[in-house]
Amino acid sequence: MKLTWLGHSAFRLENGSAKILIDPFFTGNPGFAGQDGKSAAEGITHILLTHGHGDHVGDTVQLARETGATVLANADLAAWLSAKGVAKVDMGNTGGTVHFDGFSVTFTNALHSSAQITEDGVSHSLGNANGLMLHFEDGPAVYHMGDTDIFSDMKLINELHQPDIGLVPIGDRFTMGGAVAALACQRFFKFQNVIPCHYGSFPIIDQTPDKFVAGMEGAEARVHTPKAGDTLSF
Protein backbone atom coordinates (compact mmCIF):
# COMPACT_ATOMS: atom_id res chain seq x y z
CA MET A 1 0.00 0.00 0.00
CA LYS A 2 1.13 3.52 -0.85
CA LEU A 3 -0.28 6.45 1.11
CA THR A 4 0.40 10.06 0.17
CA TRP A 5 -0.53 13.03 2.34
CA LEU A 6 -1.65 15.91 0.13
CA GLY A 7 -1.97 18.50 2.89
CA HIS A 8 -4.86 19.25 5.28
CA SER A 9 -7.06 16.10 5.34
CA ALA A 10 -6.43 15.04 1.74
CA PHE A 11 -4.81 11.67 1.02
CA ARG A 12 -4.10 9.51 -2.00
CA LEU A 13 -4.14 5.79 -1.30
CA GLU A 14 -3.08 3.05 -3.71
CA ASN A 15 -3.64 -0.62 -3.00
CA GLY A 16 -3.96 -3.21 -5.74
CA SER A 17 -6.18 -1.85 -8.49
CA ALA A 18 -7.76 0.74 -6.19
CA LYS A 19 -6.50 4.31 -6.47
CA ILE A 20 -8.37 6.44 -3.98
CA LEU A 21 -8.52 10.12 -3.07
CA ILE A 22 -9.94 11.06 0.32
CA ASP A 23 -11.19 14.64 0.86
CA PRO A 24 -9.35 16.06 -2.20
CA PHE A 25 -8.99 19.71 -1.17
CA PHE A 26 -6.43 20.96 -3.72
CA THR A 27 -7.46 24.46 -4.82
CA GLY A 28 -6.93 26.88 -1.94
CA ASN A 29 -5.12 24.31 0.20
CA PRO A 30 -1.79 25.86 1.30
CA GLY A 31 -0.47 22.38 2.00
CA PHE A 32 -1.08 21.38 -1.60
CA ALA A 33 0.59 24.45 -3.08
CA GLY A 34 3.36 23.49 -5.48
CA GLN A 35 2.08 19.94 -5.93
CA ASP A 36 0.87 18.60 -9.26
CA GLY A 37 -2.89 18.12 -9.27
CA LYS A 38 -2.75 15.90 -12.36
CA SER A 39 -0.26 13.56 -10.71
CA ALA A 40 -2.27 13.48 -7.49
CA ALA A 41 -5.39 12.48 -9.40
CA GLU A 42 -3.75 10.24 -11.99
CA GLY A 43 -5.67 7.02 -12.52
CA ILE A 44 -7.96 7.46 -9.53
CA THR A 45 -10.86 5.04 -9.32
CA HIS A 46 -12.66 6.42 -6.26
CA ILE A 47 -13.09 9.66 -4.33
CA LEU A 48 -14.22 9.31 -0.71
CA LEU A 49 -15.63 12.21 1.30
CA THR A 50 -15.90 12.42 5.08
CA HIS A 51 -18.33 15.38 5.07
CA GLY A 52 -19.60 18.38 3.16
CA HIS A 53 -17.35 21.26 4.22
CA GLY A 54 -15.49 23.01 1.43
CA ASP A 55 -12.05 22.12 2.76
CA HIS A 56 -12.96 18.43 2.36
CA VAL A 57 -15.19 18.33 -0.71
CA GLY A 58 -12.55 20.51 -2.33
CA ASP A 59 -12.08 19.76 -6.03
CA THR A 60 -14.31 16.68 -6.05
CA VAL A 61 -16.75 17.84 -8.73
CA GLN A 62 -14.03 18.78 -11.22
CA LEU A 63 -11.92 15.70 -10.48
CA ALA A 64 -14.91 13.38 -10.88
CA ARG A 65 -15.73 14.92 -14.25
CA GLU A 66 -12.14 14.69 -15.46
CA THR A 67 -11.39 11.16 -14.26
CA GLY A 68 -14.74 9.36 -14.19
CA ALA A 69 -14.02 8.22 -10.64
CA THR A 70 -16.84 7.00 -8.43
CA VAL A 71 -17.55 9.41 -5.56
CA LEU A 72 -18.70 7.99 -2.22
CA ALA A 73 -20.34 10.28 0.34
CA ASN A 74 -23.18 10.36 2.84
CA ALA A 75 -26.63 10.31 1.23
CA ASP A 76 -27.34 14.05 1.53
CA LEU A 77 -23.94 15.06 0.20
CA ALA A 78 -24.23 12.48 -2.58
CA ALA A 79 -27.52 14.03 -3.72
CA TRP A 80 -25.89 17.48 -3.75
CA LEU A 81 -22.98 16.15 -5.82
CA SER A 82 -25.37 14.57 -8.32
CA ALA A 83 -27.09 17.95 -8.70
CA LYS A 84 -23.66 19.45 -9.40
CA GLY A 85 -23.23 17.09 -12.33
CA VAL A 86 -21.17 14.26 -10.83
CA ALA A 87 -22.16 11.22 -12.88
CA LYS A 88 -20.92 8.34 -10.74
CA VAL A 89 -22.05 8.81 -7.16
CA ASP A 90 -22.47 6.15 -4.49
CA MET A 91 -23.85 6.75 -1.03
CA GLY A 92 -24.04 5.43 2.50
CA ASN A 93 -24.59 6.65 6.01
CA THR A 94 -23.39 6.14 9.57
CA GLY A 95 -22.93 2.45 10.35
CA GLY A 96 -23.33 1.35 6.75
CA THR A 97 -20.74 -0.41 4.60
CA VAL A 98 -20.31 -0.01 0.85
CA HIS A 99 -18.42 -2.70 -1.07
CA PHE A 100 -16.20 -2.06 -4.08
CA ASP A 101 -13.84 -4.27 -6.05
CA GLY A 102 -11.09 -5.21 -3.60
CA PHE A 103 -12.12 -3.03 -0.67
CA SER A 104 -15.01 -1.77 1.44
CA VAL A 105 -15.80 1.50 3.20
CA THR A 106 -17.75 1.79 6.45
CA PHE A 107 -19.17 5.12 7.62
CA THR A 108 -18.38 5.70 11.31
CA ASN A 109 -19.41 8.43 13.69
CA ALA A 110 -17.54 11.73 13.86
CA LEU A 111 -18.35 14.67 16.12
CA HIS A 112 -18.51 17.57 13.67
CA SER A 113 -20.87 19.33 11.24
CA SER A 114 -21.36 19.00 7.48
CA ALA A 115 -22.60 21.81 5.24
CA GLN A 116 -22.04 24.07 2.25
CA ILE A 117 -22.47 27.85 2.43
CA THR A 118 -24.15 29.48 -0.55
CA GLU A 119 -23.33 32.91 -1.95
CA ASP A 120 -25.98 34.53 0.25
CA GLY A 121 -24.12 33.31 3.33
CA VAL A 122 -26.69 30.69 4.28
CA SER A 123 -25.37 27.36 5.56
CA HIS A 124 -27.11 24.29 4.13
CA SER A 125 -26.74 21.04 6.04
CA LEU A 126 -25.41 18.07 4.07
CA GLY A 127 -25.97 15.12 6.35
CA ASN A 128 -23.75 13.83 9.10
CA ALA A 129 -20.01 14.17 9.35
CA ASN A 130 -18.33 10.77 9.28
CA GLY A 131 -15.12 8.91 9.66
CA LEU A 132 -14.29 6.36 6.97
CA MET A 133 -13.07 2.84 7.72
CA LEU A 134 -11.39 1.17 4.74
CA HIS A 135 -10.88 -2.60 4.65
CA PHE A 136 -8.91 -4.18 1.81
CA GLU A 137 -8.89 -7.79 0.67
CA ASP A 138 -5.10 -7.58 0.72
CA GLY A 139 -3.61 -4.73 2.72
CA PRO A 140 -3.79 -2.90 6.04
CA ALA A 141 -7.06 -1.48 7.34
CA VAL A 142 -7.12 2.33 7.23
CA TYR A 143 -9.25 4.61 9.40
CA HIS A 144 -9.65 8.23 8.30
CA MET A 145 -11.29 9.87 11.30
CA GLY A 146 -12.61 12.82 9.32
CA ASP A 147 -13.04 15.95 11.42
CA THR A 148 -13.89 14.99 14.98
CA ASP A 149 -13.40 15.35 18.69
CA ILE A 150 -12.57 12.41 20.91
CA PHE A 151 -15.53 10.21 21.90
CA SER A 152 -15.70 7.03 23.95
CA ASP A 153 -17.31 4.95 21.19
CA MET A 154 -13.96 5.08 19.42
CA LYS A 155 -13.30 2.00 21.54
CA LEU A 156 -16.13 0.21 19.71
CA ILE A 157 -14.79 1.33 16.33
CA ASN A 158 -11.49 -0.29 17.23
CA GLU A 159 -13.22 -3.44 18.48
CA LEU A 160 -15.33 -3.76 15.33
CA HIS A 161 -12.77 -2.81 12.72
CA GLN A 162 -9.27 -3.17 14.22
CA PRO A 163 -7.69 -0.48 12.04
CA ASP A 164 -3.97 -0.73 11.39
CA ILE A 165 -3.39 2.82 10.16
CA GLY A 166 -4.98 5.94 11.65
CA LEU A 167 -5.33 9.26 9.82
CA VAL A 168 -5.94 11.60 12.73
CA PRO A 169 -7.06 15.27 12.81
CA ILE A 170 -5.02 17.26 15.33
CA GLY A 171 -5.38 20.96 14.45
CA ASP A 172 -7.66 22.08 17.31
CA ARG A 173 -10.41 24.72 17.05
CA PHE A 174 -12.48 22.74 14.50
CA THR A 175 -11.31 19.27 15.61
CA MET A 176 -9.59 17.83 18.63
CA GLY A 177 -6.13 19.19 19.29
CA GLY A 178 -2.91 17.24 19.31
CA ALA A 179 -2.87 16.24 22.98
CA VAL A 180 -6.48 15.03 22.90
CA ALA A 181 -5.92 13.24 19.58
CA ALA A 182 -2.97 11.41 21.11
CA LEU A 183 -5.14 10.42 24.07
CA ALA A 184 -7.75 9.05 21.66
CA CYS A 185 -5.14 6.96 19.85
CA GLN A 186 -3.55 5.68 23.04
CA ARG A 187 -6.76 4.92 24.94
CA PHE A 188 -9.10 3.60 22.27
CA PHE A 189 -7.03 2.18 19.40
CA LYS A 190 -4.24 -0.27 18.71
CA PHE A 191 -2.88 1.35 15.58
CA GLN A 192 0.37 0.15 14.09
CA ASN A 193 0.91 3.47 12.30
CA VAL A 194 -0.64 6.92 12.70
CA ILE A 195 -0.44 10.01 10.50
CA PRO A 196 -1.66 13.35 11.87
CA CYS A 197 -3.57 15.67 9.54
CA HIS A 198 -5.80 18.77 9.50
CA TYR A 199 -3.04 21.03 10.84
CA GLY A 200 -0.74 23.70 9.44
CA SER A 201 -3.16 24.64 6.67
CA PHE A 202 -4.49 27.92 8.02
CA PRO A 203 -3.22 30.32 10.72
CA ILE A 204 -6.12 29.64 13.10
CA ILE A 205 -5.31 25.94 13.56
CA ASP A 206 -2.16 24.41 15.03
CA GLN A 207 0.83 24.71 12.74
CA THR A 208 2.89 21.72 13.86
CA PRO A 209 2.24 18.15 15.05
CA ASP A 210 4.43 18.66 18.13
CA LYS A 211 1.67 18.26 20.75
CA PHE A 212 0.48 15.07 19.09
CA VAL A 213 3.96 13.62 18.79
CA ALA A 214 4.66 14.39 22.45
CA GLY A 215 1.37 12.79 23.50
CA MET A 216 2.19 9.64 21.54
CA GLU A 217 5.46 9.01 23.39
CA GLY A 218 5.52 5.44 24.63
CA ALA A 219 2.80 4.30 22.25
CA GLU A 220 3.18 1.09 20.29
CA ALA A 221 2.05 2.87 17.14
CA ARG A 222 4.67 4.45 14.92
CA VAL A 223 3.98 8.15 14.33
CA HIS A 224 4.67 9.47 10.84
CA THR A 225 4.81 13.21 10.14
CA PRO A 226 5.34 13.40 6.37
CA LYS A 227 5.62 16.63 4.48
CA ALA A 228 2.71 17.32 2.15
CA GLY A 229 3.34 15.34 -1.02
CA ASP A 230 5.40 12.63 0.68
CA THR A 231 4.44 9.00 0.04
CA LEU A 232 4.65 6.27 2.68
CA SER A 233 4.65 2.54 1.93
CA PHE A 234 3.05 -0.04 4.22
Swiss-Prot record:
It comes from the Bacteria. The keyword Metal-binding does not apply. Coiled coil: none annotated. Keywords: Hydrolase. Pfam families: Lactamase_B_2 (PF12706). One of its GO terms (molecular function) is hydrolase activity. PANTHER family: UPF0173 METAL-DEPENDENT HYDROLASE MJ1163, UPF0173 METAL-DEPENDENT HYDROLASE MJ1163-RELATED. NCBIfam families: PRK00685.1. Belongs to the UPF0173 family. HAMAP family: UPF0173 (MF_00457). This is UPF0173 metal-dependent hydrolase Atu1317. The lineage of its organism: Bacteria, Pseudomonadati, Pseudomonadota, Alphaproteobacteria, Hyphomicrobiales.
